[in-house]
Amino acid sequence: REWFKQPANTHYLATLSELEKSDICTYEGNAHSLRRVASLEMYEEGGMRLTAASLGTLLKYPWTSEQAKKGKFNIYQSELKLMQHLADTLGLKSLGNNRWQRHPLSYLMEAADDICYAILDLEDAVEIGILSIDNFCQTLAPLSKVSKHANLGMVRSIAVNNAIKQVVAQFKEHYSAIMAGGVRYHLLKFPC
């Protein structure tokens, strides 16, 4: 994206709209994931042909690049019509200016990502010697409740299971707000 901003390379963007230029100059992995499954993978069949609900779970940031804060967004201009279709199909309320409420299942997908990345990053830290097994167990103690003598896999498994239970409880507790599109926080209250 920095390459396109260099004066010698801006001519490559000459035929694009300002919004398309914004997409290219603010490349975002979340938007690319939607583009990839909706059109690039199995492109001859029109993408992976996932259900609207499956695509909805990918949308942590259901807005375009011009609405992005901190660079996070899910919709390139090339997927804007798809997003409008998904919003209509899934009943996602428009928040105006190419911005929609999140699909309720996106909160569960986000929590699953958080659980896996956080716990596996800690496990990797033990394996490469950055974190001791004692510190690993101590960090995950609120989720795992096992002794420091347990192996990494057991601690991970128990911590993931308990984190999932926590997410389910939070989802149930805030179900009405989630379904109304009013939740603006993570479901996982992770201890580390």
Predicted features and spans:
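C-terminal subdomains that position terminal phosphate/3'-OH groups for nucleotidyl transfer/ligation
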Residues: S144-C192
